[in-house]
């Protein structure tokens, strides 16, 4: 008996107006993730995935390119307003926010969510260069 052909349903992109941009700026890399209000990821990009390797990965320009790539990916969702959550001490903190602003998003709120220990784990030893 022949199987009936299964038609693939066309995926409809849902229209989302408000989103949250999570920026993880470490000393070595910058990760930009744009989610909806519930935390479901819509798009993400990294400085390393944007073609930068080694020490160039940890530059503000690499973070800017990653933010531009991520912004380009979420344009199809109709995103207009962004709330920005910045985590980490890296060099890509400010340039990422500037790039998202230049991409045409209205930034409603900027929050620093860098985890600060209340005397938790011992930090790594100081570098001797």
UniProtKB/Swiss-Prot annotation:
Q: Which UniProt keywords apply?
A: Ribonucleoprotein, Ribosomal protein, RNA-binding, rRNA-binding
Q: Name one GO cellular component term.
A: ribonucleoprotein complex
User: Its GO biological process terms?
Assistant: translation
Q: What GO molecular function terms would the record report?
A: rRNA binding; structural constituent of ribosome
Q: Which InterPro entries match?
A: Ribosomal_uS11, Ribosomal_uS11_bac-type, Ribosomal_uS11_CS, Ribosomal_uS11_sf
Spell out the family assignment given in the record's similarity comment. Answer: Belongs to the universal ribosomal protein uS11 family.
Briefly state the protein's biological role.
Located on the platform of the 30S subunit, it bridges several disparate RNA helices of the 16S rRNA. Forms part of the Shine-Dalgarno cleft in the 70S ribosome.
The cross-references to PANTHER family, in alphabetical order and at most eight, read: 40S RIBOSOMAL PROTEIN S14/30S RIBOSOMAL PROTEIN S11
Tell me the subunit arrangement. Answer: Part of the 30S ribosomal subunit. Interacts with proteins S7 and S18. Binds to IF-3.
Name of this protein: Small ribosomal subunit protein uS11
Encoding gene, per UniProt annotation: rpsK
């Amino acid at each position: 008996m022949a199987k009936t052909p299964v038609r693939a349903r066309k995926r409809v992109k849902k229209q989302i107006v408000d989103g949250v941009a999570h920026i993880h700026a470490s000393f070595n890399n910058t990760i930009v993730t744009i989610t909806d209000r519930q935390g479901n990821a819509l798009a993400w990009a990294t400085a390393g995935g944007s073609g930068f390797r080694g020490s160039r990965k940890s530059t503000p320009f690499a973070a800017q390119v990653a933010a531009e790539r991520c912004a380009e990916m979420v344009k199809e969702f109709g995103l207009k307003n962004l709330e920005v959550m910045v985590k980490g001490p890296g060099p890509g903190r400010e340039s990422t926010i500037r790039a998202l602003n230049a991409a045409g998003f209205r930034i409603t709120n900027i929050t620093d969510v860098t985890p600060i220990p209340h005397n938790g784990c011992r930090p790594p030893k100081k570098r001797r260069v």
